[in-house]
Amino acid sequence: MAGRKGGRGKRRKVCYFTANNITHIDYKDVDLLKKFISERGKILPRRVTGTSAKYQRKLTVAIKRARQMALLPYVADE
């Protein structure tokens, strides 16, 4: 039979932005944006970070703007 043996089930991830009452994601806030980027420089998906769809879209736009303004790298250094 498929399924988990023992232990607890998966814990539901909560959206970072709704939990902290953040309504505006600023592209200049590089420290916040770096939390949602992988070590290779890719944007982490919702299933990994737990952000809601609304804030994932805003986050993606902010990261892309920060990359355009050279605040964040497009790819990570080797």
UniProtKB/Swiss-Prot annotation:
Keywords: Ribonucleoprotein, Ribosomal protein, RNA-binding, rRNA-binding. SUPFAM superfamilies: Ribosomal protein S18. The keyword Glycosyltransferase does not apply. It holds the Pfam family Ribosomal_S18. One of its GO terms (molecular function) is structural constituent of ribosome. Coiled coil: none annotated. One of its GO terms (biological process) is translation. Gene3D superfamilies: Ribosomal protein S18. Binds as a heterodimer with protein bS6 to the central domain of the 16S rRNA, where it helps stabilize the platform of the 30S subunit. Belongs to the bacterial ribosomal protein bS18 family. HAMAP family: Ribosomal_bS18 (MF_00270). Part of the 30S ribosomal subunit. Forms a tight heterodimer with protein bS6. This is Small ribosomal subunit protein bS18. It comes from Geobacillus stearothermophilus (Bacillus stearothermophilus). The lineage of its organism: Bacteria, Bacillati, Bacillota, Bacilli, Bacillales.
